[in-house]
Amino acid sequence: MEPFVEPEPQAEPQRVGYVLGLEPATTTEFRVLIDDDNYLQLDDLVVVSTQVPKAGEVRIYGVVTEVASRFEGGRFESDTLRIAEEGTMDADRTRSATVQTMRVVPEIWVAPDPGEVASRVAGKSRDEALYADEMARRLPVGFAKDGQPLWVDVDFFDGTKGAHLSISGVSGVATKTSFALAFLRLLTAHHALTPAGANLRALVFNVKGEDLLWLDKRNARITPEAREQWAILGVPAEPFPSVSFWAPVRQGPELIPDTESRMEGVSAFSWTPLEFIERGLLRFLFTETGDFRAQLTFIEERVRAQLIRNCEPDPRHPGVAIVEGTPIESLGDLVDLIELHVDPPDGEPEFAWTGRVAGGTGQAFMRRLHAAQARIGRLIRPGGRRVDRLAEAVCVVDIHKLSDFAQRFVVGAVLDEVFADKEATGQRHPLQVILLDELNKYAPREGHSPIKDTLIDIAQRGRSLGIILIGA
């Protein structure tokens, strides 16, 4: 792979205007009067050097957050016609930019003096504005509007100084997902996390369409300009070299992935009844915010404990569980067994399974289980195969055809496995990166759920465990 080669930057900053003096400039924001023969646009980086008594030169870096233009000399809106059309009033066109302070070097927080020259950053001043001069391990992740690369400090991603990545942007147009995948491609290609980076594993949940099932194929529509940009970033415009694809098993006796555009190279995933019980996956059937208030989670905890206590593997049939002498070969078998204890057709619910809850709560619990049987029943079967997250560098789990209920179950079950494995080993490396789109759906601000608890654990303890979350 070609090393990252940064384009040759301009040697010196280019003057674009002066700091306005008709209104106060502050330590956090100031305005620039733009020269007639120049321009500033949104997100441009600006530097102002100002002399501070007893401190010397202070460089103030900022980013353009707004650009405005006006006639200077008019007082009323109707003066626009007199100036522009009739020519009966004299006025000058002025353009100004609002700049928000990003960095001050040295860190003496003062406001820029009015009339100081404002320049567009370039070369070393650009590095200083973006803190790139302090990045020991900087990873190129894209380009700014000036055509120069932008970087992130890997130390703040991989757990050295911080962890996790949050991507914000417009929803529904796949821009956040596209950036997240490009980031993963650059991260794995540059091995920026060496020595651990070479063994990094990424888990990607595909929630929209089947586009991500083609990450190992070439882009037939890539342009020469895009190839050149990838080359500048130090990565060839090639697909991910190491990817595994997983999709939910299709309804029926065969282990066939439920996909449409691609079958080759896609594995079907499911869980055995024994895994479902022993790993306590029942709790991921109760992930709605109202379940906690309705005491459904209270019954679920007691039922889960009873199942684990009374469960043993069937020695003759791998994956089949035996609970109280009853073989459990499907989710339907398990629901029937639970119903005998929680909501029997004749008699009272067993205290060990339900505790002291109203009868209606037990009935609501069983209604949820019967609904779950129809939604995820095919995912619980003997001979099932769990997602193998470590087989390749990138693991794509396709859940876009599942209902919201089933998606929450799969995400919860897989994340729980990731967290449990990392806790068991106690080792940060190899790092496990998780890309989860629509993060707010799984961890809403209000309410409680097992998935939210798992994600909070990852956010709080993932840095020390080597689990890095990318949320979009």
Give the residues covered by each predicted segment.
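Long, basic/Gly/Ser/Thr-rich N-terminal segments
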Residues: 1-135
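Short amphipathic alpha-helical face segments that pack within enzyme cores
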Residues: 41, 178-183, 409-417
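Short helix/loop capping segments that flank catalytic or ligand/cofactor-binding pockets
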Residues: 42, 109, 150-151, 160-162, ...
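The Walker A/P-loop phosphate-binding site
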Residues: 133-162, 370-394
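Glycine-rich phosphate-binding loop of nucleotide-binding enzymes
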Residues: 141-241
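Conserved beta-strand position immediately N-terminal to the Walker
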Residues: 165-167, 397, 470
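P-loop NTPase motor domains
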Residues: 192-197, 204-205, 209-213, 239-460, ...
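Short hydrophobic alpha-helical runs that function as membrane-insertion/retention elements
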Residues: 202-203, 468-471
